[in-house]
Protein backbone atom coordinates (compact mmCIF):
# COMPACT_ATOMS: atom_id res chain seq x y z
CA UNK A 1 0.00 0.00 0.00
CA UNK A 2 1.02 3.57 -0.53
CA UNK A 3 -0.10 6.90 0.89
CA UNK A 4 -2.46 8.29 -1.74
CA UNK A 5 -3.40 11.46 0.11
CA UNK A 6 -3.61 13.20 3.45
CA UNK A 7 -5.48 16.03 5.13
CA UNK A 8 -4.14 18.08 8.05
CA UNK A 9 -5.72 20.64 10.36
CA UNK A 10 -2.74 22.68 11.55
CA UNK A 11 -4.78 24.31 14.32
CA UNK A 12 -5.74 21.07 16.07
CA UNK A 13 -2.95 18.78 14.84
CA UNK A 14 -5.45 16.26 13.48
CA UNK A 15 -4.31 14.39 10.39
CA UNK A 16 -5.77 11.62 8.27
CA UNK A 17 -3.70 9.64 5.78
CA UNK A 18 -5.31 7.46 3.13
CA UNK A 19 -3.32 4.39 2.15
CA UNK A 20 -4.45 2.18 -0.70
CA UNK A 21 -3.54 -0.45 -3.25
CA UNK A 22 -5.71 1.30 -5.84
CA UNK A 23 -4.08 3.40 -8.56
CA UNK A 24 -6.27 6.50 -8.29
CA UNK A 25 -8.20 8.78 -6.00
CA UNK A 26 -11.08 11.18 -6.57
CA UNK A 27 -11.32 14.21 -4.30
CA UNK A 28 -14.70 15.85 -3.82
CA UNK A 29 -15.34 19.08 -1.94
CA UNK A 30 -18.64 20.34 -0.53
CA UNK A 31 -18.64 23.29 -2.91
CA UNK A 32 -22.09 22.54 -4.31
CA UNK A 33 -24.14 22.74 -1.11
CA UNK A 34 -26.37 25.76 -0.62
CA UNK A 35 -24.93 26.85 2.72
CA UNK A 36 -27.92 25.92 4.89
CA UNK A 37 -27.15 24.46 8.31
CA UNK A 38 -25.89 21.79 8.96
CA UNK A 39 -24.32 21.48 5.52
CA UNK A 40 -22.20 24.59 5.18
CA UNK A 41 -20.49 25.24 1.89
CA UNK A 42 -16.83 24.11 1.75
CA UNK A 43 -17.14 22.22 5.08
CA UNK A 44 -16.71 18.73 3.66
CA UNK A 45 -14.28 16.68 1.67
CA UNK A 46 -14.31 13.10 0.42
CA UNK A 47 -11.26 11.08 -0.58
CA UNK A 48 -12.43 8.14 -2.71
CA UNK A 49 -9.86 5.56 -3.77
CA UNK A 50 -10.66 3.88 -7.06
CA UNK A 51 -9.35 2.84 -10.44
CA UNK A 52 -8.90 5.49 -13.10
CA UNK A 53 -12.11 6.76 -14.69
CA UNK A 54 -12.80 5.26 -18.12
CA UNK A 55 -10.17 2.51 -17.54
CA UNK A 56 -11.79 -0.01 -19.92
CA UNK A 57 -11.19 2.37 -22.83
CA UNK A 58 -7.52 3.05 -22.01
CA UNK A 59 -5.24 0.02 -22.39
CA UNK A 60 -2.39 1.95 -20.74
CA UNK A 61 -4.40 2.17 -17.48
CA UNK A 62 -4.49 -0.68 -14.93
CA UNK A 63 -7.26 -3.07 -15.92
CA UNK A 64 -10.62 -3.16 -14.20
CA UNK A 65 -11.72 -6.36 -15.92
CA UNK A 66 -12.33 -9.31 -13.61
CA UNK A 67 -12.46 -12.73 -15.24
CA UNK A 68 -14.06 -15.91 -13.86
CA UNK A 69 -12.05 -17.46 -11.01
CA UNK A 70 -10.10 -14.23 -10.44
CA UNK A 71 -10.25 -12.54 -7.05
CA UNK A 72 -10.75 -8.82 -6.58
CA UNK A 73 -8.47 -7.65 -3.78
CA UNK A 74 -7.96 -3.96 -3.03
CA UNK A 75 -7.35 -2.28 0.30
CA UNK A 76 -7.99 1.16 1.77
CA UNK A 77 -6.76 2.27 5.20
CA UNK A 78 -7.69 5.57 6.86
CA UNK A 79 -4.95 6.30 9.41
CA UNK A 80 -5.76 9.01 11.95
CA UNK A 81 -2.82 10.79 13.55
CA UNK A 82 -1.98 13.71 15.77
CA UNK A 83 0.88 15.91 14.61
CA UNK A 84 2.61 18.80 16.31
CA UNK A 85 3.64 21.83 14.29
CA UNK A 86 6.37 24.26 15.29
CA UNK A 87 6.18 27.55 13.46
CA UNK A 88 8.90 30.14 13.33
CA UNK A 89 9.11 33.29 11.36
CA UNK A 90 11.53 36.11 10.82
CA UNK A 91 10.18 39.62 10.80
CA UNK A 92 11.34 41.62 7.83
CA UNK A 93 11.82 45.35 8.38
Map each language-model feature to its residues.
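Active-site pocket scaffolds in enzymes
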Residues: 1-85, 89, 93
Amino acid sequence: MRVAGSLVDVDSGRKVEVLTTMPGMQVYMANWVDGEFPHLQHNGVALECQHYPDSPNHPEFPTTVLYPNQTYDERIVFRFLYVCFVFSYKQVN
